[in-house]
Curated annotation (Swiss-Prot):
Entry-annotated residues carrying Phosphoserine: 401
Protein name according to UniProt: Flavin-containing monooxygenase 3
UniProt note on tissues of expression: Detected in liver and kidney (at protein level). Expressed in kidney and liver. Weakly expressed in lung. Does not seem to be expressed in brain, adipose tissue, or muscle.
Keywords, sorted A to Z: Endoplasmic reticulum, FAD, Flavoprotein, Membrane, Microsome, Monooxygenase, NADP, Oxidoreductase, Phosphoprotein, Transmembrane, Transmembrane helix
Binding site for NADP(+): 60-61, 195-198
Its EC number(s): 1.14.13.148, 1.14.13.32, 1.14.13.8
InterPro entries with a match to the protein in the record: FAD/NAD-bd_sf, Flavin_mOase, Flavin_mOase-like, Flavin_mOase_3, FMO-like
High-level lineage: Eukaryota, Metazoa, Chordata, Craniata, Vertebrata
Keyword Oxidoreductase recorded: yes
UniProt catalytic activity: trimethylamine + NADPH + O2 = trimethylamine N-oxide + NADP(+) + H2O; N,N-dimethylaniline + NADPH + O2 + H(+) = N,N-dimethylaniline N-oxide + NADP(+) + H2O; hypotaurine + NADPH + O2 + H(+) = taurine + NADP(+) + H2O; (S)-nicotine + NADPH + O2 = trans-(S)-nicotine N(1')-oxide + NADP(+) + H2O
Length: 531
């Protein structure tokens, strides 16, 4: 008899979970509170309680070759960085092509998940749902939670003295949809994340003045990287990860900061992070530096206090006549249908083994998919998480002991503090994390073996983009088209730009970084010979 799995949410994480369950012979039932798939990427012109929300102009920060489901490339003519409507089209196409829609119960709200009385022996869960004011409870062998992120806004009003006296508008970026309302107004955006920068840059075209207040600064990256290629196809490679993790810290930090400052000097723009060597996820915005140069956006430090019409910053400067304050201050995690102690088992912090499994459960029958954040794309990450989780639920993969899992969490927390600083998010190194998950299910590519067996593919895998197709080359869920997808990824990336053909397709030299590094010892050797 097939094991029944409840999947909560039909965004990209939920679809990955459904598909992984089917691949492992499990029986998924997905509960989605809205009327469509897509989750965060399904745009609505109004906000709804308990649902993720985006603004109309949102584009992806990851390119199409790096953020696809590993066996489902985007159409050739799709742009590298997509408008949310284009990504929603892809997500819907994936759900349809993989025949996943029949496993989803739409407009169904999960109100409660409880352990069954015999949980310690069976690992089963009682899931209560509500649809059309009618409640139902069903028993499942396992639960995969694929919601809860980007839903519950973090609005730290208590951190800003005098805000209660402020007479202008005040709201979270979750409620922002389009700029027209604020034409000719003076707007303060608090927060220097992706949403804050996007909203500030967009508003600066219609508002009288826009100020961004940032407590700690941030690196701001462009989607357009060296020689005009998508940033992640150049930066997220196994070779660069190898260098970062093996070079002396001083050299690694120097190289990282050099990359971050390649486009412009962050100090000159007031954007420089307080600790520039931390690998916190940077902000992606192609327009912000230009808006700062044009004077329509200014960067200020943290707000010290508010008055009825102004904000006083920590440097003593004042922004007068404010019409609106937008808090782009991120989101918290919340699972109102679940006992908090299951996910936040220690110090009220999210405590999950590999960012997925609650370690204290007697049976490993609950998994949280899509909570981990890294510099890589969400879709391939959730796909690999779901594949491993499905195998654990099926029983083909076994988790370590509780003590070992807690020790691993502590170790990862220490590394997180070193590389990413103090943050409430579960942040990790993308390629290291993906390889770790892939190794659990036998899907990690063996690079050395590839160099012997298929040198052309090995060169692309090691020096080229660490694209999602790499994790369907071998093992369970192997895709026969993975090799060709890897070898043709640059063609698909460049095709939508060839609307005016002026020459052949110019692919990047995969060895460029290697050759630059090789030049250093050569120059040193020449210097020693000459003297």
């Amino acid at each position: 008899m097939k094991r029944k799995v409840a999947v909560i949410g039909a965004g990209v994480s939920g679809l990955a979970a459904i598909r992984s369950c089917l691949e492992e012979g499990l029986e998924p039932t997905c509960f989605e509170r809205s009327d469509d798939v897509g989750g965060l990427w399904k745009f609505s012109d109004h906000t709804e309680e308990g649902r993720a929300s985006i603004y109309q102009s949102v584009f992806t920060n990851s390119s199409k070759e790096m953020m696809c489901f590993p066996d489902f490339p985007y159409p050739d003519d799709f742009p590298n960085f997509m408008h949310n409507s284009k990504l929603q089209e892809y997500i819907t196409s994936f759900a349809t092509e993989k025949n996943l829609l029949k496993y989803i119960q739409f407009e169904t709200l999960v109100t409660r998940i409880n352990k069954c009385p015999d949980f310690s022996t069976t690992g089963k869960w009682e899931v209560t749902t509500e649809k059309n004011s009618k409640k139902e409870t069903a028993v499942f062998d396992a639960v995969m939670i694929c919601s809860g992120h980007h839903v519950y806004p973090h609005l730290p009003k208590d951190s800003f003295p005098g805000l209660n006296r402020f007479k202008g508008k005040c709201f979270h970026s979750r409620d922002y949809k389009e700029p027209g309302t604020w034409k000719g107004k003076r707007v303060l955006v608090i927060g220097l994340g992706n949403s804050g920068c996007d909203i500030a840059a967009e508003l600066s075209h219609v508002a009288q003045q826009v100020i961004i207040s940032s407590r700690s600064g941030s690196w701001v990256m462009s989607r357009v990287w060296n020689d005009g290629y998508p940033w992640d196809m150049v930066v997220i490679t196994r070779f660069q990860t190898f260098l970062k993790n093996n070079l002396p810290t001083a050299i690694s930090d120097w190289w990282y900061m050099k990359q971050m400052n390649a486009r412009f000097k962050h100090e000159n723009y007031g954007l420089m992070p307080l600790n520039g060597t931390l690998r916190k996820e940077p902000v992606f915005n192609d327009e912000l530096p230009a808006r700062i140069l044009c004077g329509t956006v200014s960067i200020k430090p943290n707000v010290k206090e508010f008055t009825e019409t102004s904000a006083v910053f920590e440097d003593g400067t004042v922004f007068e006549g404010i019409d609106c304050v937008i808090f782009a201050t991120g989101y918290g995690y919340a699972y109102p249908f679940l006992d908090d102690s299951i996910i936040k088992s220690r110090n009220n912090e999210v405590t999950l083994y590999k960012g997925i499994f609650p370690p204290q459960l007697e049976k490993p029958t609950m998994a949280v998919i899509g909570l981990v954040q890294s510099l890589g794309a969400a879709i391939p990450t959730t796909d690999l998480q779901a594949r491993w989780a499905a195998q654990v639920i099926r029983g083909t993969c076994i988790l370590p002991s509780v003590n070992d899992m807690m020790d691993d969490i502590d170790e990862k927390m220490g590394k997180k503090l070193k590389w990413f600083g103090n943050s409430t998010t579960i942040q990790t190194d993308y390629i290291v994390y993906m390889d770790e998950l892939a190794s659990f299910i036998g899907a990690k590519p063996n690079i050395l073996w590839l160099f012997l067996k298929d040198p052309r593919l090995a060169i692309e895998v090691f020096f080229g983009p660490c694209s999602p197709y790499q994790f369907r080359l071998v093992g369970p869920g192997k895709w026969s088209g993975a090799r060709n997808a890897i070898l043709t990824q640059w063609d698909r990336s460049l095709k939508p730009m060839k609307t005016r053909v002026v020459g052949g397709i110019q692919k990047p030299c995969l060895y460029s970084h290697f050759l630059r590094l090789l030049a250093v010892p050569v120059l040193i050797a020449l210097f020693l010979v000459l003297i």
